[in-house]
Amino acid sequence: MKTRLAVVFAIAGLAAASVQAQDAVVRPQQTIQFKANAYGCVSKDKLDAADHHAQAGEQQQMQEFFSGYQCVSTPSDSDFRVVRVVGHDVEFVNAANSDTEGLWANDRFIKQ
């Protein structure tokens, strides 16, 4: 019985490690590039709200964030520096400057 339990824990540990290995970790000071059709918002709250509207299929409400310049499209071939990471959201700035506050984007937009 103890052997079976040990095998179950070993398999569960390997499964968890493989999932973690597939999910690339983004860290502050890392240089990143964004995928096509990515966007960033002036605050994490604005990003959360825009993502909520996007996932709900509410295109007009989401578009209002872009019309008011609360969210902007990010170029896919530019380098950005990660300032801060909160869950799956990253605060980023242009890699060429030393700003300490920037825009927020979801890590699903980052090229791996």
Segments from the language model and where they lie:
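N-terminal signal peptide c-region/cleavage motif recognized by signal peptidases
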Residues: A16-S18
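Repetitive helical segments and hydrophobic/amphipathic motifs
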Residues: I11-G13
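SH3-family beta-barrel domains
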Residues: Q22-F65, T74, V86, F109-Q112
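Bacterial N-terminal signal peptides that target proteins for export
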Residues: M1-V7
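SH3/SH3-like beta-barrel superfamily modules
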Residues: V25, V72-D107
